[in-house]
């Protein structure tokens, strides 16, 4: 049996590994490489895929979405070689790294893509629940932000109902953070001023 000190050091190491991987600002890197300047200077100032889409480059936005998700998936899967607790720590680290990347003043994205990526790495069936909830909400409301909020709310409930308390607790915490990061969107949803999917301007 591993010593408690070693176990704790392993978890801290996994958390740091996840954070470093998650803090790679792909949205910023890709837009600069494409000659589109600093994505933080347009739209919401966010480095995530939604704001990258405001550059008008759909392929770049899709690439940002995929890479931001893969950060979470890779962190969880690599750390899983050292056990589920290490995978959970690394996944959470990647999520936090995306939200608060040290390289750009701790101002990152809103975390939805990385949330999904971590979910794929830790409980792929939960990712299907997320996708289904997102699609249904999007079809009914046409609000991308609301779809993400509903999907992230459903995930910990689904995980808990399947008897996975550890993952349910992790994603409950991550869901709370996603809601906090979307507080401006929530205000606009309540005011009826949030942009709908496909809306111009």
From Swiss-Prot:
Keywords annotated in UniProt: Cell inner membrane, Cell membrane, Lipid biosynthesis, Lipid metabolism, Membrane, Phospholipid biosynthesis, Phospholipid metabolism, Transferase, Transmembrane, Transmembrane helix
Catalytic activity: an acyl phosphate + sn-glycerol 3-phosphate = a 1-acyl-sn-glycero-3-phosphate + phosphate
Membrane topology: Multi-pass membrane protein
Residues that span the membrane, as ranges: 10-30, 60-80, 86-106, 116-136, 166-186
EC numbers on record: 2.3.1.275
Single GO MF descriptor: acyl-phosphate glycerol-3-phosphate acyltransferase activity
Enzyme class name: transferase
InterPro entries found in the cross-reference section: G3P_acylTferase_PlsY
A GO-annotated cellular component: plasma membrane
Domain of life of the source: Bacteria
Pathway stated in the Swiss-Prot or TrEMBL entry: Lipid metabolism; phospholipid metabolism
Pfam family, one: G3P_acyltransf
Cellular localization per UniProt: Cell inner membrane
Keyword Chaperone: no
GO biological process: phospholipid biosynthetic process
PANTHER family cross-referenced by the UniProt entry: GLYCEROL-3-PHOSPHATE ACYLTRANSFERASE-RELATED, INNER MEMBRANE PROTEIN YGIH
Protein name stated in the entry: Glycerol-3-phosphate acyltransferase
Native source organism of the sequence: Brucella canis (strain ATCC 23365 / NCTC 10854 / RM-666)
């Amino acid at each position: 049996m591993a010593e408690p000190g070693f176990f704790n050091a392993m978890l801290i190491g996994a958390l740091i590994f996840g954070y470093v991987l998650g803090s790679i600002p792909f949205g910023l890197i890709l837009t600069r490489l494409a000659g589109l300047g600093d994505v933080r200077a347009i739209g919401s100032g966010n480095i995530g895929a939604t704001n990258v889409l405001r550059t008008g480059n759909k392929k770049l936005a899709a690439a940002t979405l995929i890479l931001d998700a893969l950060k979470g998936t890779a962190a969880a899967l690599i750390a899983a070689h050292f056990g589920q607790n290490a995978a959970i720590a690394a996944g959470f680290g990647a999520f936090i790294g995306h939200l608060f990347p040290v390289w750009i003043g701790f101002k990152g994205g809103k975390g939805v893509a990385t949330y999904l990526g971590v979910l794929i790495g830790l409980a792929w069936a939960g990712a299907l629940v997320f996708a289904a909830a997102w699609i249904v909400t999007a079809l009914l409301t046409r609000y991308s932000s609301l779809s993400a909020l509903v999907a992230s709310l459903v995930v910990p409930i689904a995980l808990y109902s399947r008897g996975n308390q550890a993952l349910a607790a992790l994603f409950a915490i991550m869901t709370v953070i996603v809601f906090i990061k979307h507080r401006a969107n929530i205000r606009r949803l309540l005011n009826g001023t949030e942009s709908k999917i496909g809306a111009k301007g």
